[in-house]
Regions:
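All-alpha prenyltransferase/terpene-synthase fold signal
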Residues: 1-304
Length: 304
């Protein structure tokens, strides 16, 4: 726990010592621990990435003409999925907008989740582990800026929003890179595609969050564009355009793939589903007739 504390450098993610024994006792019950794990796994990122990682890994193995053992493949993929699992409770702890009654449990679980992820990823070798550590460091920076803007809304600006999105692109981009064991050219191509696809999904998640919470998330692209334009409806429209820009950058990665790469059609289908995911939540937002309410709330908050 102390190692995790010094590494994360964020007191908000650390369990208060006075709660430690109670949380340990609670999580020692298998049914409680299983429930918390299931809640973490109930994540759009986790659901969307597992088949993608398998496709990238198999595509890279075929391209490099390698026979990779099933155990090693599972370790690399599972390790990165577990790392994404870790980003979920960390985000929930910072945002405090989901699973509020379970956040102390997540704080105790986080160091163990990270340890398991590292152990599995390290089986890919030093280069793979180094890429993961660099990506994890970037993701922590993104979460720090996210928290800074959440607690100090006056710090919301374009530059900070770009850095904040490291929490999406760093974890997913690194995972993509390591599906090719951090080797050129596929490692760089996978990194670009997964990083930008993750940022695109991030826009969709912010729209979904607005629907679930019945308020614009702080920080988020919809809030940033609302602050600039003073028009909430326009802000969500621009957020959709921002997501399309991210997706176009992700599509560049598909066009960069070598001709002999066999999984290109699957990746094209993946990006189509990402686009549909965002469009679905935007359509739900418009149908839900919440934008006028959001505008009223925004106007009141700006006048304060």
């Amino acid at each position: 726990m102390k190692k995790f504390t010094s590494e994360i450098g964020s007191s908000e993610l650390i369990l208060d010592d006075t709660k430690l024994n109670d949380v340990k006792t609670r999580l020692s019950r298998p049914e409680i621990l299983a429930d918390r794990i299931q809640r973490i796994l109930n994540s759009n990122f986790v659901k969307m990435t597992f088949p993608v990682f398998n496709a990238l890994f198999d595509g890279a193995s075929t391209y490099y003409k390698e026979e990779i053992s099933k155990d090693l493949k599972n370790s690399i993929i599972d390790g990165h999925v577990i790392a994404i699992d870790l980003s979920e409770p960390m985000d929930r702890i910072i945002d405090e907008d989901e699973d509020a009654e379970y956040l102390d449990d997540y704080k105790l679980m986080n160091p163990y989740i990270l340890e398991i992820a590292r152990e599995k990823i390290s089986q890919g070798g030093d280069s793979v582990l180094k890429a993961f550590e660099e990506g994890f460091k970037d993701a922590r920076l993104g979460q720090y800026i996210d928290y800074k803007m959440k607690t100090r809304p006056e710090s919301i600006n374009y530059e900070n929003m770009i850095i904040c999105y490291k929490k999406y692109r760093a974890v997913m981009g690194t995972a993509g890179r390591n599906m090719a064991f951090n080797r050129a050219p596929l490692g760089d191509i996978f990194h670009l595609g997964m990083a930008k696809a993750a940022e695109c999904v991030g826009c969709g998640n912010e729209i979904q969050d607005a629907l679930k919470q019945r308020s614009i998330k702080t920080p988020s692209w919809p809030l940033y564009y609302s602050l600039i334009s003073k028009d909430v409806r326009k802000a969500f429209e621009i957020t959709m355009k921002k997501s399309e820009i991210y997706l176009k950058e992700a599509d560049l990665a598909v066009h960069m793939l070598p001709l002999e790469f066999q999984f290109k059609p699957f990746l094209e289908f993946l990006f189509l589903t990402v686009n549909h995911y965002n469009q679905y939540w935007y359509n739900e937002l418009v149908r839900g007739d919440m934008l006028d309410s959001f505008q009223k709330d925004f106007n009141i908050s700006v006048r304060r």
